[in-house]
Amino acid sequence: MRFLIVTGLSGAGKTQAMRALEDLGYFCVDNLPPVLMPKFAELVAHAENKIEKVALVVDVRGQKFFQDLDWALGELTKLGIKYEILFLEARDEVLLKRFKANRRGHPLGVRGSQILDNIKKERKFLENLRARADKVIDTSDLQPADLRNEILNYYGEEQKRSKISINIVTFGYKYGLPLDADLIMDVRFLPNPFYVKELRPLSGSDKPVYDYVFNYEVTKKFTEKFLDLIEFLMPFYQKEGKSNLVIAIGCTGGRHRSVAIANFLARTLEEKNYEVYLRHRDLEKHREE
């Protein structure tokens, strides 16, 4: 039985994660009190109709919650039930924006308290639990569909895969590093189409920009060597039990060079029969500024 505990910061996307897990065939329970977790796990393990995958969504509700959860996790271990923890988080300003958009109060809020103060308080409460998590997803820059795809990718066919899946994400250094990246490659050393007037409004997904970037010998040599490195590392990551490799490709704004390189890598790795997922995190951000 796969026993997954979904937790994290309020507003980080636990509801969307649960819906994705349900689509994967998980038996999902929302807001089960931690003190009931060991008994629930026993009942599920010995159910007449065998349940293969279980996901419990656990929210913060106060200091006693953490004492109860710590006890419950210890009891699960005593019962021989192997569990995994998925922790969802987001940046403070993103969580604040979500709470205001939904016009909801924070679970830790009391009359007169500020949402941002409660977010910081909850983050502090959850530090130790986050450190114990098997998987941490930062949803700050993810749309609901992106989070769903990440859940489906990581928890879907993991046990059946013979190869690691590869997530390639592009980003702009001016917007910050992706927090979940395993490998980060800085491609700001490549010639920059931004300084070519007719190419500036385009992206690395447009042929003129792509051709400009790959017209240079340094680009061809770099991508050849980087592909060699990725393929060299894959069997070692697989040997240690890794099922998903996140490769982040960054340039200044995340629009030209990183996108062109990532598109090339994704296409080439797919041709080599790797399972590849591609996302351009900051591609549209210039339109919002």
UniProtKB/Swiss-Prot annotation:
Gene3D superfamilies for this protein: P-loop containing nucleotide triphosphate hydrolases
One Pfam entry name: RapZ-like_N
Claim: Lyase is one of the keywords in the record: no
UniProt: ATP binding residues: G8, L9, S10, G11, A12, G13, K14, T15
Assigned keywords, A-Z: ATP-binding, GTP-binding, Nucleotide-binding
Residues that hold GTP according to the record: D59, V60, R61, G62
MF (Gene Ontology): ATP binding; GTP binding
Primary role: Displays ATPase and GTPase activities.
Protein family: Belongs to the RapZ-like family.
HAMAP family: RapZ_like (MF_00636)
Protein's name according to its UniProt entry: Nucleotide-binding protein CHY_0272
Organism: Carboxydothermus hydrogenoformans (strain ATCC BAA-161 / DSM 6008 / Z-2901)
